[in-house]
Curated annotation (Swiss-Prot):
NCBIfam families: PRK00026.1, trmD. One of its GO terms (cellular component) is cytosol. The lineage of its organism: Bacteria, Pseudomonadati, Pseudomonadota, Betaproteobacteria, Burkholderiales. Gene3D superfamilies: 3.40.1280.10, tRNA(m1g37)methyltransferase, domain 2. It is found in: Cytoplasm. It comes from Albidiferax ferrireducens (strain ATCC BAA-621 / DSM 15236 / T118). One of its GO terms (molecular function) is tRNA (guanine(37)-N1)-methyltransferase activity. It catalyses: guanosine(37) in tRNA + S-adenosyl-L-methionine = N(1)-methylguanosine(37) in tRNA + S-adenosyl-L-homocysteine + H(+). This is tRNA (guanine-N(1)-)-methyltransferase. One of its GO terms (biological process) is tRNA N1-guanine methylation. Homodimer. Belongs to the RNA methyltransferase TrmD family. Its EC number is 2.1.1.228. Pfam families: tRNA_m1G_MT. Its main location: cytoplasm.
Length: 248
């Protein structure tokens, strides 16, 4: 798969693409990441990519033409017409289902906005989907692009040390969309806080039941809407429901 990143600050991506376990996906080409700067497609000696907003107001707006020329150059290098994603507060909040969809795709073109945003005419003409990380505003779309790339990369075969590691992540359908359970490692007692005895028992059935109940309890306390969704989807057993009833 290939992701083209349209950004005024391509240098921000260098450490991200060469660090951590997900670098395997990028360095091997399993997830091909290409960077494009709209400033390279701007006219004039100053390569200007932004201007004041019509109607007045603070800040600057990214101009449509440099973005459009940059996008056309990218599309000409791809073998298929790629969807164009814009990271924006107006977008749908990124979640596991969306990440899974993009991890199974051929990739996309990711637009990283800056300043007050993009000229709406470019959005209307080219953007096929908008994505948000949540109800807050960043200085640009680069961090959001990295979040999507990281989430997609770790789902690719051979990237994680254990192939099924991501199946135990929070929100994964394998866990019925619940939050993950707490985890512990050595020492067995730290500052008077012992590891739960069941995890030291070697009794795998009891351990798995404990983990299931911890996931249920944690999700009920912190993200009750996920419990409701799992119930609607028919993912909760009678034992699950009995445990949840005991927590009320």
């Amino acid at each position: 798969m290939r992701f083209d990143i349209v950004t005024l600050f391509p240098e921000l991506f260098a450490p991200f693409l060469t660090s951590g376990i997900t670098r395997r996906a990028f360095e091997s080409g399993l997830v091909d990441v290409q960077l494009a700067n709209p400033r390279d497609f701007a006219a004039g000696n100053y390569r200007r990519v932004d201007d004041r907003p019509f109607g007045g107001g603070p800040g600057m707006v990214m101009m449509a033409e440099p973005l459009a020329q940059c996008l056309k150059s990218i599309q000409s290098q791809r073998t298929e017409i790629a969807p164009v994603l814009l990271f924006s507060p107006a977008g749908q909040t990124l979640n596991h289902a969306m990440v899974q969809r993009w991890s199974d795709s051929q990739g996309a073109i990711l637009i990283c906005g800056r300043y007050e945003g993009l000229d709406q005419r470019f959005i209307d003409a080219y953007v096929t989907e908008q994505i948000s990380l949540g109800d807050f505003v960043l200085s640009g779309g680069e961090i959001a692009a990295m979040a999507l790339l990281d989430a997609v990369a770790r789902l690719q075969p051979g990237v994680l040390n254990a192939a099924d590691s991501h199946q135990q992540d929070s929100f994964n359908p394998v866990l019925d969309g619940l939050l993950d359970c707490p985890h512990y490692t050595r020492p067995e007692n730290w500052l008077g806080r012992p590891v739960p005895e069941v995890l030291l028992s070697g009794h795998h059935v009891q351990i798995e039941r404990w983990r299931r109940e911890q996931r249920l309890a944690l999700t009920l306390r912190l993200r009750p809407e996920l419990i409701d969704q799992a119930r609607r989807d028919g993912r909760l057993s009678r034992a699950d429901e009995a445990f949840l009833a005991s927590q009320v």
